[in-house]
Amino acid sequence: MKDRNASAEPVVKPGLSPSRFVKVFMHGEPFGRKINLALHNNYDSLSFTLKKLGNNYSMSPFELEGLVNKEEDGAIDSDFDLLYDDMDGVRYFLGDVPWEVFTTTVKKIYIVPAEQQNENDYQEEEEDNAAAAATADEDGDGAAADDGVAAAADDVDDVAGYTSNDDPSFD
């Protein structure tokens, strides 16, 4: 008679638990999903499942397990960036480190639409630029570079050589 438990157990490397669940968050969704890393042997398998999940976030875990890596399933053409946080809270792109390192250090995975990732980069760049501009104006004169030129209070009305003193309606 065949032992049921022997065939049901996933093949796991020594030192790792048979299940390694990691929370996956889809951008714009209020909740996360868990996936079992022990069911994946490489980045290709994991990224296929994550991209398929990104296209069908409401899919049940049983439906996701039944997926095979086929191009007609639509996951290959998905336009998602896959990111993850390690145990130290540092964010990486999926595939930046060797698979063995990833499986032992991953804490959370994020599925982000590619255009959203670019918008986030732009927003972070704008915030960095605004912070740099605020710190560059050390003396508060409105000039980021202190080149000896500063706006005086009486120069505020001066627009292209025209001042309020030249206008008779200001009497």
Curated annotation (Swiss-Prot):
Residues 162-171 have a biased composition (Polar residues). Residues 19-114 form the PB1 domain. InterPro entries: AUX/IAA_dom (IPR033389), AUX_IAA (IPR003311), PB1-like (IPR053793). SUPFAM superfamilies: CAD & PB1 domains. It holds the Pfam family AUX_IAA. The keyword Transcription regulation applies. GO terms for cellular component: nucleus. Keywords: Auxin signaling pathway, Nucleus, Repressor, Transcription, Transcription regulation. Residues 142-153 have a biased composition (Low complexity). Residues 117-171 are annotated as: Disordered. The keyword NAD does not apply. GO terms for biological process: auxin-activated signaling pathway; regulation of DNA-templated transcription. It comes from the Eukaryota. It is found in: Nucleus. Belongs to the Aux/IAA family. Lacks the EAR-like motif (domain I) which is conserved in the Aux/IAA family. Aux/IAA proteins are short-lived transcriptional factors that function as repressors of early auxin response genes at low auxin concentrations. Homodimers and heterodimers. This is Putative auxin-responsive protein IAA29. It comes from Oryza sativa subsp. japonica. The gene is IAA29.
